[in-house]
Amino acid sequence: MNYGKENVAVYRTYATPLEGVRTIPESSFDGRDNVLFGLDVRVQVEGEEFLPSFSEGDNTKVVATDSMKNFILHHAGEYDGATLEGFLEFVGSGFLDTYSQMSAVEVSADEIRFDELPVPEDDGDGYEASDLVFRVSDNESGYGSISLTRDDGTPVITDQTSGVTGLELVKVEGSSFTGYVQDEYTTLPEREDRTLYISLDIFWSYDDPEDALGEDPERYVPSEQVRDIAHVVFDEVDSNSIQDLIYQIGLRVLERYPQLASVRFEANNRTWLSVRDDLDGDASVLREPPAPTGFQQFSMDRGDLDEQ
């Protein structure tokens, strides 16, 4: 039994910058200014005291979902942290502190990202990023989910997930797909080298969920760095399947971040199909694949890294 509000778009200007994150070899990301901090939020609440609203039409204990929306928007102005997950914990704890009839809260959000735009420098010699004008990004975005309940009246985190979603990558060569089952149902030809196009969502959980909040930035895992690990491993590895590729990405993520307990993948194969291979050199013409498309899901933890 639960209810809530979703698609709550909230934007905060000049939020606290994210600074002091640990850098890694695969990424140049070392922080974000948070001049624009945007989220698409979903909140779900639980509590036995809400049962009469379902069984008897008695709304005495019901917090209207419109009020939940307003609560989220108001708290965006009160939040003094720098991370998506930190804001979710701040809002979730606020709900539990404010409404005793709520026994558990789950708050999740997709980050709304903004791209920096170049403008001429004042002296006309080159370009610099504008600190006023941004472009709404169509690229991948961060994700977070925080679940909370009470322990002796104090809100505590019971579950946490962070992620980067909507990552789309194309590798023009250096990927294969061979050695799979050949039977009367097989029509797909083996490919020793192919242009591989995948869409990818990556999720991770910390050993200590408090690390997800970003209060100690050196233990925070930015989604931008995980994104960069994915494309660097894709560039480095000659994979024989998408399964092979995401496993190698997972190993690298766990290697770089010992504070993580697990990493999970949801991948979709969007590989283009060859139309012409008779062009000079390595050139070819390809087309979009028809529906249906293949997908892969995989979870791994530190035990997988220890076995290497």
From Swiss-Prot:
GO terms for biological process: purine nucleobase catabolic process; urate catabolic process. Urate binds at T65, D66, F177, R194, I242, Q243, N269. GO terms for molecular function: urate oxidase activity. Its EC number is 1.7.3.3. InterPro entries: Uricase. It catalyses: urate + O2 + H2O = 5-hydroxyisourate + H2O2. Pfam families: Uricase. SUPFAM superfamilies: Tetrahydrobiopterin biosynthesis enzymes-like (SSF55620). Residues 283-308 are annotated as: Disordered. Keywords: Oxidoreductase, Plasmid, Purine metabolism. It is an enzyme of class 1 (oxidoreductase). Belongs to the uricase family. NCBIfam families: urate_oxi. Catalyzes the oxidation of uric acid to 5-hydroxyisourate, which is further processed to form (S)-allantoin. This is Uricase. It comes from Haloferax volcanii (strain ATCC 29605 / DSM 3757 / JCM 8879 / NBRC 14742 / NCIMB 2012 / VKM B-1768 / DS2).
